[in-house]
C-alpha cells in the first residue's frame, strides 16, 4: 500500500514538473498599455497595438490596451509600474523627470521614451457665430477643458493660465466625445482638445453646428507662450480638415511618445517596436487612424 501510494506521489510530482516546464506553460510577459479617453488618439494607439495580428500571435508577450484619463495619468502609472507602456506627451515626460509638474514635485525617473508617435495640436472649437475669436474671449463662458488627469486638461490649464483666463471661465472637465455632445446641446460655448487631427469629436460637433477653430497660434505668439514653454512647436491645422473651416488655423503642438517603464525587459521593448515599425505594422497603424502616417523609422 505504501509502495503504491509512493508511486502515485512520484507520478503526480513528475506530471507537475512536465506541466511547469512544458512550452505551452511558459508565462507570458504581460504588458498593460495605457491609452486615453474615448474620442482621443491615445486610445487608438493602444488599441491598434493590441489588435495587430503579429502582436496578438506572440507566444511570450501579451499586450492589453487600457483606457485612462490621458498623459498625466499614464506618466504616473507607468512610473510606478501599474502600466508597463503607455502614450505620454513629451512635455509631461520632461516636466515629470525634472520634478516640475504642477503641484507635484515628484521626479518621475522610471519612464523611458522608446519612440516618437505623432504631433498632437491644441484645438479650441467654438460656434461660428459665437463672437469668440481669441482665448481671451472665453471669459464668462462654459468651456470643456478635457478629462481631469489628462494631458488635454493639463495643457489647457497651462495655456489658459498663461493667457489669464483659467479662473475666469466655467470649467467642465470631460472627455472629447462628451464635450462634443454637450457643445451640440448648447451646454458648452467651446471645448478644448489636445489631440491629432482630424478628431472624431470635432467631426461630430461639425455635423450639428457650424464651427470655427480659434487661432491659438496668434494667442501663443503674442503672449510669449513659446518662450515660456519651448517644448511646444508651431503648426497649422489645414483648411478643410473639418466641415465649414475653410482656412488654415495656426496652433501649437506637443509630441506624443511611446514610453515604457525602465524595468520592462529590453527584448520585449525591441520586439514590439520591431513589429509595429515594420512595413506591415505601420500600414496597420495608418489603417487605424490617418494621423499615424507620421510614424516612421526616421522619426
Where on the chain are the PLM-derived regions?
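Bilobed "Venus flytrap"/periplasmic-binding protein-like clamshell domains
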Residues: 28-56, 61-64, 116, 120-185
Amino acid at each position: 500500500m505504501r509502495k503504491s501510494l509512493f508511486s502515485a506521489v512520484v507520478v503526480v510530482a513528475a506530471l507537475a514538473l512536465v506541466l511547469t516546464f512544458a512550452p505551452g506553460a511558459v508565462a507570458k510577459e504581460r504588458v498593460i498599455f495605457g491609452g486615453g479617453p474615448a474620442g482621443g488618439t491615445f486610445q487608438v494607439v493602444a488599441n491598434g497595438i493590441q489588435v495587430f495580428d503579429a502582436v496578438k500571435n506572440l507566444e511570450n508577450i501579451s499586450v492589453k490596451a487600457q483606457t485612462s484619463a490621458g498623459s498625466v495619468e499614464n506618466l504616473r502609472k507607468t512610473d510606478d509600474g501599474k502600466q508597463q507602456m503607455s502614450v505620454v506627451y513629451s512635455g509631461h515626460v520632461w516636466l515629470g523627470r525634472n520634478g516640475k509638474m504642477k503641484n507635484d514635485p515628484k521626479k518621475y525617473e522610471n519612464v523611458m521614451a522608446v519612440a516618437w508617435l505623432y504631433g498632437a495640436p491644441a484645438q479650441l472649437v467654438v460656434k461660428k457665430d459665437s463672437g469668440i475669436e481669441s482665448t481671451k474671449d472665453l471669459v464668462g463662458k462654459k468651456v470643456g477643458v478635457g478629462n481631469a488627469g489628462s494631458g488635454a486638461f493639463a495643457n489647457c490649464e497651462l495655456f489658459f493660465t498663461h493667457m489669464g483666463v483659467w479662473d475666469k471661465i466655467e470649467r467642465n472637465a470631460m472627455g472629447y466625445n462628451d464635450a462634443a455632445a454637450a457643445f451640440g446641446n448648447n451646454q458648452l460655448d467651446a471645448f478644448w482638445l489636445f489631440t491629432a487631427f482630424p478628431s472624431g469629436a470635432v467631426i461630430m460637433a461639425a455635423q450639428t453646428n457650424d464651427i470655427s477653430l480659434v487661432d491659438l497660434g496668434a494667442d501663443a505668439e503674442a503672449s510669449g507662450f513659446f518662450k515660456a514653454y519651448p517644448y511646444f512647436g508651431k503648426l497649422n491645422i489645414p483648411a478643410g480638415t473639418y466641415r465649414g473651416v475653410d482656412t488654415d488655423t495656426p496652433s501649437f503642438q506637443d509630441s506624443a511618445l511611446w514610453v515604457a517603464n525602465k524595468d520592462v525587459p529590453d527584448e520585449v521593448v525591441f520586439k514590439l517596436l520591431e513589429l509595429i515599425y515594420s512595413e506591415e505594422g505601420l500600414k496597420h497603424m495608418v489603417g487605424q487612424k490617418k494621423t499615424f502616417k507620421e510614424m516612421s523609422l526616421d522619426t
